[in-house]
Amino acid sequence: MKPRHKKLAIIASSVTALGVASVLVLNAFQSNLVFFFSPTQVANNEAPVGKSFRIGGLVEEGSVKRQADGVTVNFLVTDTAKVIPVVYTGILPDLFKEGKGVVAQGKLASDGIFRADEVLAKHDENYMPPEAAGALDQADKARKTVMQ
């Protein structure tokens, strides 16, 4: 093999290896990507059904219902405009309370119920995830506009 052919073979194999590595990295990145949606966006069918995402808002007052098994909890998440039912099986965070901020990660079932794999509660009375706070503000503005 001539030096020129060796050089071309090295360049071609390097480009191929770089391409394969890029595809693997992008695939791993996309599979770990989790989007945030507000209850209004979920109710408006903007959230994917059957794919993992996060929903955030407030736990609606009087909506927390524990099932007989002791670990399954049903509750409603609201952004003051729309309400989404959530089912979670597991131990809830200590700070999980009605009327407080929550972010749940899971999948929306075809029946419209969000099945959470993980529930995160705010860590003090002043904190709310920026996405949830923004969604609540937008929903509140929209609700006030409709009422006028």
UniProtKB/Swiss-Prot annotation:
A GO term from the CC aspect: plasma membrane
Disulfide bonds: none
Topological domains, Cytoplasmic: 1-7
Keyword check for Protease: no
Keyword Aminoacyl-tRNA synthetase part of the UniProt annotation: no
MF (Gene Ontology): heme binding; metal ion binding
Membrane topology, Periplasmic segments: 29-148
Keyword annotations from UniProtKB, A to Z: Cell inner membrane, Cell membrane, Cytochrome c-type biogenesis, Heme, Iron, Membrane, Metal-binding, Signal-anchor, Transmembrane, Transmembrane helix
Lineage: superkingdom: Bacteria
Amino acids binding heme: 123, 127
One GO term of the biological process aspect: cytochrome complex assembly
Regions that span the bilayer: 8-28
SUPFAM superfamilies per record: Heme chaperone CcmE (SSF82093)
Membrane topology: Single-pass type II membrane protein
Compartments, record wording: Cell inner membrane
Free-text function comment from the UniProt entry: Heme chaperone required for the biogenesis of c-type cytochromes. Transiently binds heme delivered by CcmC and transfers the heme to apo-cytochromes in a process facilitated by CcmF and CcmH.
PANTHER family documented for this protein: CYTOCHROME C-TYPE BIOGENESIS PROTEIN CCME HOMOLOG, MITOCHONDRIAL (PTHR34128:SF2)
Protein family according to the UniProt entry: Belongs to the CcmE/CycJ family.
UniProt protein name: Cytochrome c-type biogenesis protein CcmE
Annotated source species: Nitrosospira multiformis (strain ATCC 25196 / NCIMB 11849 / C 71)
Gene name tied to this protein: ccmE
